């Protein structure tokens, strides 16, 4: 019996190592990148290309040179590198536990024709939306230990609205030099435990600069606590130890939208 167990373990280990070696062959990675890009292009009905996909130890995926056009044929998303490392065991209990996500060198271009029109990324939301006519409540259980963002740019335009050079305009935003280090300890349907260790952003048109924002937030459907809040602007700094908020339900925040 012991010999049989050793044989089985040896076969499983051999298959595991063989799969890892196979997925790290450059030609296999190229074929996999083309296959995944074609499948996503079919789902999204838009052009998408992927330079390389690298899967390491079957729980880490690295995607290089991702490019997605909107349905008008203009570049909507460009990412130099996206990598994620996740824990496999929590998946069997319906939980998503990601130990690390890295998003480096990205450029996102969002727009809509008029304030009432749908945005150019609506087709992505529609493609992955549930087709069930009966609405089911999803039990969200997500953990991201570390989310690192570097060298990010985001633009947003309502094309029918006038630009205002030198002034902040929510209809024409140019965010650049986005840097973030975020930890999401727990996110469920009615609770959150997260920390923004660092967030910095510049707005190109107005010259606004958020040098650093940091805080820790713990909340549920009736109360929220924000700790270690600190914000640094070029000529202003503000820090608060603890902020408490009480409310009847999460629906109370709908009035702020």
What are these regions (language model features)?
Residues 1-45:
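N-terminal type II signal-anchor transmembrane helix
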Residues 9-10, 16, 131-137, 200:
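Mature-chain termini and adjacent capping regions
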Residues 42-65:
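Short extracytoplasmic
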Residues 46, 65-188, 208, 236-256:
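Secondary-structure transition motifs
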Residues 53-54, 185, 215-218:
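Short, exposed beta-strand/loop patches in secreted or surface proteins that constitute
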Residues 58-59, 188, 217-223:
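Short, solvent-exposed coil/turn segments at beta-strand boundaries
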Residues 197-199, 223-230:
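Transmembrane beta-strand segments that form the barrel wall of outer-membrane beta-barrel proteins
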Residues 207-212, 218:
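Contiguous, well-ordered beta-strand patches that form the walls/edges
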């Amino acid at each position: 019996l012991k010999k049989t167990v050793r044989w089985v373990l040896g076969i499983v280990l051999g298959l595991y190592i063989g799969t890892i070696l196979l997925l790290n062959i450059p030609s296999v990675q190229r074929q996999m990148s083309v296959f995944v890009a074609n499948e996503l292009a079919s789902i999204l009905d838009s052009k998408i290309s992927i330079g390389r996909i690298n899967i390491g130890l079957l729980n880490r995926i690295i995607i290089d040179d991702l490019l997605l056009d909107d349905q008008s044929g203009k570049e909507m998303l460009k990412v130099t590198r996206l990598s994620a490392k996740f824990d496999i065991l929590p998946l069997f209990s319906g939980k998503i536990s990601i130990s690390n996500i890295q998003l480096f060198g990205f450029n996102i271009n969002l727009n809509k024709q008029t304030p009432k029109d749908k945005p150019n990324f609506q087709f992505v939301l529609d493609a992955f939306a549930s087709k069930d006519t009966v609405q089911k409540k999803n039990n969200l259980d997500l953990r991201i230990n570390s989310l690192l963002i570097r060298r990010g740019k985001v633009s947003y335009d309502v094309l029918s609205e006038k630009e205002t050079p030198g002034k902040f305009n929510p209809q024409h935003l140019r965010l650049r030099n986005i840097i973030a280090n975020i930890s999401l300890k727990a996110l469920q349907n009615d609770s959150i435990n997260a920390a923004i260790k660092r967030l910095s952003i510049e707005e190109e048109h107005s010259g606004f600069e958020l040098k650093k924002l940091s805080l820790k937030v713990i909340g549920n459907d009736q109360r929220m606590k924000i700790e270690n809040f600190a914000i640094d602007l070029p000529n202003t700094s503000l820090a608060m130890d603890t902020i408490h908020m009480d409310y009847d339900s999460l629906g109370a925040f709908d009035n702020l939208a």
